[in-house]
Amino acid sequence: MRLVRPADARDARALATMLGALLAEHQIRYPDTYPRLDPVAGAAFYGAEWGRRLGTDPSCNVWLAADRDIRGFLAGEVWSRPVGEPPSAFFVEWVYVVPEHRKSGISRALFRDGLLPYCRRHGIDVVEGRTVPGDEQWARRGWATTAVSVMRGVDALMLDVAERSGDTALEGARQ
């Protein structure tokens, strides 16, 4: 009998273990993932955060799929926008299913029995997420790309924006 239930602070250790496995898997499958998180340190950080926030912070939500053991989780937060549409969205941060239980409907159950009823109860009409280059699973499932994150190292950006002879944009401002 599979059950999807909200996680609570007592689940933080199991969540951290699964997140560590997800981070390690992602670094192998998507070596250019940004930002890079050490699987152990990243899992420890998020596990501690979940332990602190679950049950006390209504914007932090995690659902577990369990049978006799925990087989997967979906974690995310409600994001509000002071300006723009939609005014709020649920941002999915992590979805993970233990490898030996994949392709058995667990991920669908986490969305169907955990996230979607929550969104309906709270008037949330949009679910968002972020993925890494090369991870095409979301597009295959009908998710639309709405934004692309970009990054540049500070040292490289410093070279990009260095003053050059002929720059006149701020000559008067520096005097």
What name fits each language-model region?
Residues 3-18, 23-29:
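A short beta-loop-alpha structural element at the N-terminal edge
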Residues 24-50:
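Conserved GNAT-fold acetyl-CoA-binding loop/helix
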Residues 44-63:
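A short helix-loop-beta-strand connector motif used in the catalytic cores of GNAT acetyltransferases and
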Residues 64, 69-78, 91, 96:
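Conserved beta-strand in the GNAT
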Residues 80-92, 102:
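A conserved beta-turn-beta hairpin within the catalytic core of GNAT-like acetyltransferases
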Residues 81, 128-132, 139, 144-159:
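Conserved catalytic-core motifs of GNAT/GCN5-like acyltransferases
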Residues 97, 103-117:
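Conserved acetyl-CoA-binding loop-helix of GNAT-fold acetyltransferases
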Residues 119-131:
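Conserved GNAT acetyl-CoA-binding A-motif
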